[in-house]
Amino acid sequence: MNTSGMSDIDPITLSVLSGRMEQIADEMDATLFRAAFNPIIAEAHDASHGLYHAISGDTLVQGKSGLPIFVGVMSFAVKAVIEKAAKDGDLADGDIYIFNDAHIGGTHLSDMRLVRPYYRDGELFCYLASVGHWHDVGGAVPGNYNPAATDVFQEAFVLPPVKLARAGVMNTDIVDRSEGVV
């Protein structure tokens, strides 16, 4: 991300750009809430979206309609993807990471995260991230809240950050694996 000249931006331009980014995050919220089959997301709005800094993963803006509890943790999810991509060395336009590991930028296993790098003119511009509460992700009991569980793996399917899509092509192995546990 090119940051040269950023201190020269005038307050009006800054306000317009900030408002546009907020609108993008709000539209991400509205799109998921309208399209969701899951009533926890569609009705209770147990989800959130935002735009995150391309280098640091820090929160730039977050949608107004999602749950505010995710504001504090979503940047950790994005940072986990940045670290994973740096380790693997293969971040590309159209990649989408999915995961629910609560120890890596999360809240609990029912909150599934999607993180996508967004490129502008061939350069990484920011990350788009979404989190939403899923009814069931393969735990021993419906809803994943098992008071008899003695470790996290008895609560639900733990998915580390993996590519759901690679350069815009769906990774059907991840979809098939996930369907096998829920």
Q: What is the predicted role of each segment?
A:
Residues T3-V78, G180:
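Long, charge-dense accessory insertions within large macromolecular proteins
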Residues T59-L60, P68-F70, I104-H108, W134-G138, ...:
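Flexible loop/turn segments at secondary-structure boundaries
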Residues D121-V182:
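Mobile "lid/hinge" segments at catalytic clefts and subdomain interfaces of large enzymes
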Residues I12, S65-G72, A85, G105-S110, ...:
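Alpha-helix capping and helix-loop boundary segments enriched in small/acidic/polar residues
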Residues A25, P68-D101:
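A charged amphipathic helix-loop-strand protein-protein interaction module that recurs
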Residues A35-P39, S48, A86-K87, A102-G105, ...:
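Generic recognition of flexible, low-complexity loop/linker segments
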Residues D95-D136, T150:
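Sensory/regulatory domains in signal-transduction proteins
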Residues I41-A44, D88-L91, T107-L109, D121, ...:
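Solvent-exposed alpha-helices and their adjacent loops that cap or buttress functional pockets
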